[in-house]
Amino acid sequence: MTPELLTVLLITGGILIFLAIFFTLVPIPLWISSLAAGVRVSIFTLVGMRLRRVTPSKIVNPLIKAVKAGINLNTNQLESHYLAGGNVDRVVNALIAAHRANIELSFERAAAIDLAGRNVLEAVQMSVNPKVIETPFIAGVAMNGIEVKAKARITVRANIDRLVGGAGEETVIARVGEGVISTIGSCQDQKEVLENPEMISRTVLAKGLDSGTAFEILSIDIADVDIGKNIGAVLQTDQAEADKNIAQAKAEERRAMAIASEQEMKSRVEEMRAKVVAAEAEVPLAIAEALRDGNFSVMDYANYLNVTADTKMRQAIGGQSSPNDTQ
């Protein structure tokens, strides 16, 4: 291989390597597309995006859409939002939709909403086309104790000014449910709700439930009303059952106390009977001592025996028994 041929090969290889690096760093097709769309983006700007690890197509393509829609944006705005972790394409689409619908929305506001985790495009679309939120059955109890179940449809429109920091759909549903329960509870009976369900809508809508939320409530419509259980009767039945159990417990307590008192009386009777038997056992000893001392004569003892025998005979005739006989 001659030196001239080697030089040509090295030069050719160097040119190919340079072109490969150049086309890698500089997206020529994208640059041509931007020029054709009337968007002035320099090649050095595209190279700078590559060096900052930014995909040029994710900046230039949304910029082309924005310029064609008549929105004045630049690459620095889109690139800074991209580097902050935002969705550039969705923000630009939201700006275009807001511009077409004559909704005032700046890029800074849209970028802040997007970085806050909200879907700014969906919010703009909801501002143009309100969303209907359907609640589950909400149960309330009228004054007569009858349960009334109501299902509501809430028509809301996104409030772009309150998207950042405003409460979501769950809060709206919870507030509407609270208002429905309160309104049903203020009715005398279930007939009042069935005859005039729009009363619930008017009462709940007048409370300003969209305060502090990301939505503006346009209307609240009662879609369905159903009658549930007789809660008042259930509560009365439960109360009666509880009262019965309490009365039974108190009666059982009194019965136990009566049984204990009866057993105590029996014990006292047996105690007294034992004392009588003990006293009777001392009688012969007292008689013997009286005979020895001369305080009790034989005739007196004979009379005592006659009286005792007469008493036993009378008790036998009367069907009674002396304490000694029972022992």
Curated annotation (Swiss-Prot):
Topology of this chain in the membrane: Multi-pass membrane protein
Main location (coarse class): membrane
InterPro entries: FloA
Residue stretches spanning the membrane: 8-28, 29-49
Record keywords, A-Z: Cell membrane, Membrane, Transmembrane, Transmembrane helix
A GO cellular component entry from the record: membrane raft
Tagged with keyword Transmembrane: yes
Keyword match Cell membrane: yes
Record's subcellular location: Cell membrane; Membrane raft
A Pfam family it matches: FloA
Family in the record: Belongs to the flotillin-like FloA family.
NCBIfam families: PRK13665.1
Entries under HAMAP family matching the protein: FloA
Function description: Found in functional membrane microdomains (FMM) that may be equivalent to eukaryotic membrane rafts. FMMs are highly dynamic and increase in number as cells age. Flotillins are thought to be important factors in membrane fluidity.
Subunit structure: Homooligomerizes.
Protein name (database record): Flotillin-like protein FloA
Native source species: Exiguobacterium sibiricum (strain DSM 17290 / CCUG 55495 / CIP 109462 / JCM 13490 / 255-15)
Lineage: Bacteria, Bacillati, Bacillota, Bacilli, Bacillales
